[in-house]
Amino acid sequence: MIGVSEYTRFFEDHCLQLYILDGGATVKFCIGDDADLETLLVSMETTASNLKMVLAPIDASRIKVQMIDQLFFGVARGIDWNTLSRTIVNRVCGSAGFPIPNEHPKAALTDLAEIYSCDPRELQRDINREFQKVIFKDHNMVQDFRIAMLRLCQYEFRTGQVSDVEAEAINQWLVGELKQVSLLRSARIFRKVDRTNARGMLFSLVRWINKGGYSGLLVTLDLRQFFKPRVVGTDDLPILYSRAAVIDAYESLRQLIDNTDEFKNMATVVCLPPEFLNDRMRGVDAYQALKLRIYDEVRDQSRDNPFGSLVRLGASSDLGSHLARTEKGDDNGC
């Protein structure tokens, strides 16, 4: 087992800084009791803040994690879309030759035209051309996502091309709250986010976060709800998972692992109780395709491998002394 503080330190220094921030992606499964997992989740908040990553905490008791579209919506609800759009707008204006003054960080089209004493229509033409280059022609993002981000940036810059109703509909579409997709026809978006396109939307979201100046996305998936019994007489009932739903969730995680080469700058930390290893009905044995990707059948019983996909949290191991030797230069690292 590896102590929580030791593993968190290792994860930040060796996995995130040396791999994820350099364009990598990974999925880690952390097994521990409630106290250890709560400590891990809190420490991930600090880690994300230290590395300027966007943290997306997903709790299976509140979000149906077996559905990839609901997983995307859960991540999207934690994103400040307006702030990201403003960051891109300011960057685009700068690259177009019209940098936003520090004293006017939220300057709109007419404000910027007045500052630079130019025709607003000509300025809009130049900025729209740059929007096309930075956003719409970036094919690392799927088309619907590119269109949505282009419209949000145009709305943030107040170009007059996007109405309040359309901008609000886009924000609702991103978080799964849009009732009528027909509200987005004028924006050339014709379908909702569902399980068939949500994975591509998640790829695109990570790319957009990077454009907005963040170093990456850190997702924490708290799946302890999979193994909790049904509670009777509770007003605020959490989501209950059947065995089929649990296996569907494992299938989504398996796909996430297989798609790590398509993600960049994204780390997923999956938090699970010890039952994940022991429960044959709901644990890793219930879905062999996932087990084959993460389970360490051949491992050292006396030493923990922090690089492994499956990490057992608990009493401190000798990892702490190893890290200390590494910092002093007495060791070449793990």
For each of these PLM feature ranges, what is it?
Residues 20-212, 334:
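P-loop NTPase nucleotide-binding core
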Residues 6-10, 34-37, 197-199, 247-250:
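A short linear-motif detector with a strong N-terminal bias
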Residues 1-15:
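N-terminal pre-Walker A segment at the start of P-loop NTPase domains
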Residues 152-334:
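The catalytic "switch" region of P-loop NTPases
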